[in-house]
C-alpha cells in the first residue's frame, strides 16, 4: 500500500478524430495530467494541465474514467499512489505548443489508431478507448 496518495486529473484531447499525446522525459507517450492542488476541482486541473503542457484550449465533454498506479518516489523516499480522473475533451483545431520547459520531449496530434499503439501504458489505452466511445456516442456518459 502506498504511503502517499496523490489525486490527479488529466485530459484525453481530440481534435476531430486525432488525439493529442506528449512524450515525457522518460520517453513514454502519455496524455496531459497533473496533481490536484489548492482546492481546485478535477475539471479545473485537467483543463489547466492540457493548456499548460500542450498549449491547447479544450472543452470537457464528459468524465472518461479513472486510473491509478503506484511508484516509489526517490525524492520523498516512499511509495506514492497516483489516482487520476480522466476527462474526454474536444479542441476546436489542431494547434498546440509543447511545454519543453516542463521536460516534455515531443508531442503531436495522432490518428486514433496510431495513438492507441503509441501510448506506453495499457491503462491509458483503455481510457483513450473509453473517451473515444463517449465522444462518438458509443458509450454512456457518466460523471
Residue ranges with predicted function:
Residues 130-137:
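C-terminal alpha-helix
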Residues 1-32:
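N-terminal strand-loop-strand
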Residues 36, 91, 112:
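Hydrophobic pocket-lining residues within nucleotide cofactor-binding pockets
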